[in-house]
């Protein structure tokens, strides 16, 4: 009869196994804690948004409402003027974000691939735009949009003819488009820096081959670099769209009508409906927040897999 020897587990092996189990448990506790911190506001927002007015005074109702109701969502939809505000957001913020994605890429390619005397100065200015907070430059920026000029030429002509011919871009989408076109819009410095770091990591052989075949810098960028840089383009696009979508600072400075969703939500929070903040209004406020972030949640859910892959790729190359 064969005797099977039981493997001996030494104290050292037992300690190693114990540390492994403890590390596994600690890792999952940490993940669950972070998930709770991040997801709790969203779950709370959804729960409150679909509660009936009677559920707010019922102490037995915590997460799952006894009476589901779209009353809060309907009220918030009307208060936000959702359809019109969504159109304003798409026309102003989303278009600006997409323009910025392209202009920052072109600017970054020039900084990453070409050497010239002023390159270090431009890189210093680029870093400076990331470090300097927006409130420090918002006043001169708003004045520039009110009296748009090019090296003072229009102002000089206006003084000669006695008529101020400097255009007023406030309350127009152009106050957002023009900074985006010249890669100086919202978070443009950060996006340009991300592009620069990514382009530096791309191999130059294909670009050199295209140059030998007679392709210029722009054609090389469009035919070689852009198809090879889908990951960074996706990353910057998502960040740019989200930052523009959530922006209220520039929108309140440049616009006095036709507000985007983020500004209308802020106005609701600051108005009587927000100042009361009782059981009747908290549901409407949470429903308004849910309606504003819903398009971004849908976008992220659709692009989640590609976004995670792009983040990994950008981290490796950049």
Where are the model-predicted features located?
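Short, Lys/Arg-rich, polar N-terminal cytosolic tail immediately upstream
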Residues: 1-18
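A structural signal for multi-pass alpha-helical bundles of membrane permease subunits
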Residues: 4, 23-318
């Amino acid at each position: 009869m064969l005797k099977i020897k039981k493997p001996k587990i030494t104290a050292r092996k037992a300690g190693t196994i114990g540390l492994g189990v403890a590390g596994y448990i600690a890792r999952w506790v940490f993940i669950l804690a972070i998930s709770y911190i991040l997801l709790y506001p969203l779950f709370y927002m959804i729960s409150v948004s679909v509660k009936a007015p009677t559920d707010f005074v019922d102490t037995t109702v915590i997460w799952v409402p006894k009476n589901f109701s779209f009353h809060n969502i309907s009220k918030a939809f009307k208060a936000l003027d959702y359809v019109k505000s969504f159109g304003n957001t798409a026309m102003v913020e989303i278009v600006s974000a997409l323009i910025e994605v392209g202009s920052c890429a072109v600017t970054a390619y020039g900084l990453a691939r070409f050497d010239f005397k002023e390159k270090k100065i431009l890189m210093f200015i680029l870093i400076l735009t990331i470090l300097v907070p927006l409130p420090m430059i918002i006043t001169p920026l708003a004045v520039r949009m009110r009296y748009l000029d090019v090296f003072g030429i229009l102002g000089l002509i206006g003084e000669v003819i006695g008529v101020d011919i400097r255009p007023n871009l406030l309350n127009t989408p152009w106050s957002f488009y023009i900074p985006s076109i010249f890669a100086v819009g919202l978070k443009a410095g950060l996006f340009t820096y991300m592009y620069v770091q990514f382009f530096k990591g791309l191999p130059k052989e294909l670009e050199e081959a295209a140059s030998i075949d007679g392709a210029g810098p722009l054609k090389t960028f469009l035919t070689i670099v852009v198809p090879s840089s889908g990951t960074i383009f996706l990353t910057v696009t998502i960040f740019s769209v989200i930052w523009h979508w959530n922006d209220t600072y520039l929108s309140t400075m440049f616009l006095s009508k036709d507000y985007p969703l983020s500004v209308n939500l802020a106005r609701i929070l600051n108005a009587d409906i927000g100042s009361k903040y009782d059981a009747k209004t908290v549901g409407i406020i949470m429903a308004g927040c849910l309606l504003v972030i819903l398009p971004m949640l849908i976008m992220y859910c659709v692009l989640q897999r590609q976004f995670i892959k792009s983040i990994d790729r950008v981290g490796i190359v950049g």
